[in-house]
């Protein structure tokens, strides 16, 4: 990394020293705030940390339906920058489309003599995000960036030609890094697929194919399951679970069910779920360690698990006592990909994404039950087999995190003048 020959004190705490020929300019002189309303026919936009500001229909996760008040939404033009309610976490977003967006957001038009792609990198850099966090007001869900404070802060501005050179350098380097990360992510997904295959096979075939076991098999009668060990029982969940509902424990720990992790302690400080939580939690259901919890609206996605915690969950969840099955085997089996199609099959609804699993449907789901000793043996086998896979996954994920941290540092160093991009490009060429 080549440094500039001459630096100066920027006079700005978050910047420190910058190249002598760079300018420092207050944000209020870099942007003009835009607050135009009354464009109800424009497409509704949403601000995302991953994709920038894009049409709402293109966003793959939640969609907030706006039925009225379109006149009150703010106009965003292509090339604007948008401060959303979550910008303090991931930077200010660039608008790739024209449309309208929440009136709670701040819309900024970039002034002349600034290259938008340079500002894009700057707005998403680690050092700038640290600055944003000093301008946050409110607590928890009410946190927001105070633009009155932020506009008084300053940004580093190299000459326009140098802004373009920095962007060219970063586009090349970031492209290489992103390509590497994508390849590593593919390897991680392959390992996760292998892990799921190992689990699904073990909880439906038992030890028949391992350690020279020669177990007779029989047809399960389920197309995607195929054969199961002949000595296993097939029981509907009505024989394995007992739905209960104990309330009036508002002071217990608030829990939630996440598809990938199972039952977790809900962290209200970082919760990005945006689900409404009432002040009075007396209607929430008590769940104890070892009980089975199902999010009835998302069961078809795999949002259910045996809990390792005591706490309370939403009234929209089913809470169940377990019987007959070893809880660790039941948890591993029921959360495997072998069983998710059953929950999809018994969930009903008019629109995809709003399917509801009824108590009757839940109790009709079949479960393939080995003898208790075999359940324990299968759990031990799965734990041993998946431990080695998890170790590989962890190694890949740690490598990806290191590369992502390098990417963030590279961007921050380039846009704040800590490295001479012009010299870097000359050496590369």
For the regions a language model picked out, list residue spans one by one.
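Sequence-specific dsDNA recognition surfaces
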Residues: 10-11, 28-78, 220, 238-289
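Amphipathic alpha-helical coiled-coil/heptad-repeat segments
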Residues: 1-15, 21-23, 158-212, 369-429
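Ligand-binding loop in jelly-roll beta-barrel domains
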Residues: 110-115, 322-327
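Non-catalytic DNA-recognition/assembly elements of restriction-modification systems
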Residues: 6-39, 152, 160, 164, ...
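Short, ligand-facing micro-motifs at secondary-structure edges
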Residues: 40-62, 81-106, 117-121, 130-136, ...
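A short glycine-rich beta-alpha junction/loop motif
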Residues: 8-10, 85-86, 99-106, 139-164, ...
